[in-house]
Structure formats: C-alpha cells, structure tokens
Amino acid sequence: YDVAGHKEAAKRGLPKLRDSVSAFPVMTDKKNVDVFKKFKVLSKTEVASREHIFVEKYIKQVTIEAETAALMARTLILPAAIRQQTELSEAVAATEAADVSTSTIRTQLEQHVELVNKFNEAIEALEAAGEAHHEDVHKHAKHIRDHVLPAMNELRDLADALEARISADLWPLPSYREM
C-alpha cells in the first residue's frame, strides 16, 4: 500500500502488520476469537488450530523456496559463473601471450571473481540460515522472516548481478529478457 493507505489504516485504528509472521498471532487475539465464537463460526480451539496450521504452512513453503534457491544457485548458476571465470582467465592469458595490455579484461576478471566469491558465500549463508530449527513454530517463523528471507534476497540480488555478467550461451536459466 502507499503512504495514504497506511495513514488511513492508522486513522481507523487498524493494526500495522508488515508481514505474515506478524499477522498470524492476531488471529488468536481475544477480540477476534470472540467474534468467531459469537457467530458460531469457530471455537477458540479451532481458531488456534488454524493459526498454527497457517504458521506451519508458511514455514514449509518458505523452507522449500529457500532450499530450491540454494540448490539452483549451487548446481546451475555457480557452475556457469565458474565457466565464465575460466573463459575470462583464458582471455587474460591469451592477451598477455600476445603482449597486449590486459588491464580491461583483468579488471573484468577481478570483478567477476569477487562477485562469484560473494555469491558462494551467500549460498552458504542461506544454507546455514535454513538449518536452524526451533521447536516453537512462532520462533521458527520469526527466524525464517528475519534470517532466511533476507539471505534469499541477498542471493537473488547476486544472482541477478551474475546474470548481467555471464555470457548468454553459458547462462543456464531463462533470462528476464527471454521471459
């Protein structure tokens, strides 16, 4: 929503819930449970059960997305980035052998290597964030929101940067241009 929408919500006394993890517990607020009970829609236990199911579904869905992102990054994008790095390295060597200045291509190689290293670190960070588990589903959901989602976003940003640098013939996925 735009700023006007947030202002209108505040004016009406509506809660400012930025994400699902913040919204889930509101389901079981007494005033909400009372409305469900009053109109015989759901009992307190049923509301709590539904809220628990929503939290578990969120955890499962984001976990699958994170595992898929890490797998694609490690098995598709990283190998393509390494092949691009190899091609750049060979170009530097061939240019040096021809006794021609390599400053431009060497800079490209150095920037690419730095990006590949950051990308690999981001894969490891996402995998590490995904390994943490909490018995309490609400704590686990908060961990996912606060650690796994930011790690996925960082990995995505780096993958986008690599896509812009890697030759189209090496890139293993449909590009934005192709979609």
Ranges and model annotations:
Residues 1-179:
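C-terminal amphipathic alpha-helical interaction region
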